[in-house]
Amino acid sequence: AYTGRGDLEHLDEALVAGLDAGMTVNEIKEILVQAYAYVGFPRSLLALQTFMTLLDERKAAGINDTIGKEATPVPDMDDTTKYALGKKNLAELSGVPADAPASGYAVFAPVIDKFLKEHLFADIFDRDILSWQARELATVSVITGVGGVEPMATAHMGICLHQGLPPDQLSALLNIIEINLGPEYTMPLRPVVE
């Protein structure tokens, strides 16, 4: 949530907590890289720089964090194949059939639908460092931290539920966000898990 909000001071503390809880360096990097798709390059890059500085400080203090596995390279594909993969991944992720008619922004600005399917749901979601459940939990956290994007946050919470995350796990995430950012960020989202 701190990445979405751009709160680097508190992000640093959350990164320490993640490492201390057993997350690997590569798992955290993957979350921060994926965040750019939801909050833009500036916040993602600043979060990555914050993480780099933290790792340097920990190393200097004699703390050796677990790097973790590297992502299996996503095969090179032409745009048509990549679009088809992204479309398939999105359908599996959301439960919305791949052949459902386009609507909303996908009709108004078809190029954004192309970018989402080829890049976010093929290039990023096909990487194997994080499960889809972990990616969606991270997405809910990041976009909730942005504030004012409740329709997106509730949609991603629905995807979490579709992916088999229990409502109490989403509720626990909202509790953590509420403790750290305040109830104004979480109250509009509570009906999804109640």
Enumerate the language-model features and the residues they cover.
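Short alpha-helix boundary/capping elements
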Residues: 1-8, 23, 39-40, 142-149, ...
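Short, structured motif recognition centered on aromatic/hydrophobic residues
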Residues: 1-2, 15, 31-32, 134-144, ...
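Acidic, glycine/proline-rich low-complexity segments that act as flexible tails and inter-domain linkers
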Residues: 3-20, 43-132, 162, 175-194
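Short runs of predominantly hydrophobic/aromatic residues within well-ordered alpha helices
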Residues: 11, 28-29, 44, 134-137, ...
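Short conserved catalytic/interaction loops centered on acidic-Pro-aromatic/His motifs
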Residues: 12-14, 150-158, 171
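Helix N-cap / loop-to-helix initiation motif
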Residues: 22-29, 131, 164-169
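Substrate/cofactor-recognition hotspot
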Residues: 30, 34, 39-42
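Short amphipathic alpha-helix initiation/capping segments at coil-to-helix junctions
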Residues: 130-131, 146-153, 163-167
